[in-house]
Amino acid sequence: MVNVIDYMPGDTLLHRLNPVVKLGLAAAIIVGIFLSDTYVALLGFLALTLALGAYAGVVDRLFSLLKLLIPLALIMLVLQLAFMRDGNVVRGFITDTGLITGSKACLRLLGVALPLILMLMVTKLNDLANACVEVLHVPYRYAFTFTTALRFVPVFGQEMNAIMEAQTARGVEYDTKNPIKKLKLMLPLCVPLLISSVGKTDATALAAEQRGFYLRTRASSYKRYPIKGLDIAVLAISAALIILGFLF
């Protein structure tokens, strides 16, 4: 999970798209999933995301993310079955409405989590920030904050692993199957991680200020991000995906 959103170099059409268009495509898939109400549409959007990942050469990372999300999806399914009392009883406390609602919720969870991660894998964060500033006219401070937060995710993951390894060397066992016990073991790790994050944030803010962060404008970037014909075609496909989600 530490490297799941790291940029994967490539020369595919997906890599060459305008970063804003990539975000639009990911948003269209997510909106389409929320609008869809049939298994065919939900599975279709999920298959489309995996197919795009295979084309971009990052499908193995998507599958690793799916492995992490499946237990959470199963927990959601159990909760839906336990609390949804509408419909006909299938067996025990399970109703047909609860089964249908829970299974669709699981597919939505899996489908919504992947598109944005996929787009981050095929987009450099600097390009994403600069394109949002140039094309969407987002203030640079907001784009910088968003991309910096994404950069800190793998850094904090590595620091968490380092702290856990140090604690394991002292005899702490984190491989327990008891979730409550594991939570009690993980909570104390948040204190050193929080202190480290505050220090890194302060150092980043100081470095940005010394480099004239507040003087940066849309024209400060030397690289341009024009919307080309391929980008327009992908935007049209994105609109079609939203319409398909609404219809199905």
What is the predicted function of each stretch?
Residues 1-23, 27-41, 45-48, 158, ...:
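Transmembrane alpha-helix interface motif
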Residues 18, 62-63, 119, 153, ...:
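Buried hydrophobic packing residues in well-ordered domains
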Residues 35, 51-59, 122-123, 246-247:
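Structural signal for the C-terminal ends of transmembrane alpha-helices
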Residues 46-53, 69:
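Hydrophobic transmembrane alpha-helices of multi-pass, membrane-embedded glycosylation machinery
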Residues 58-67:
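Interfacial helix-loop-helix linkers and transmembrane-helix boundary segments
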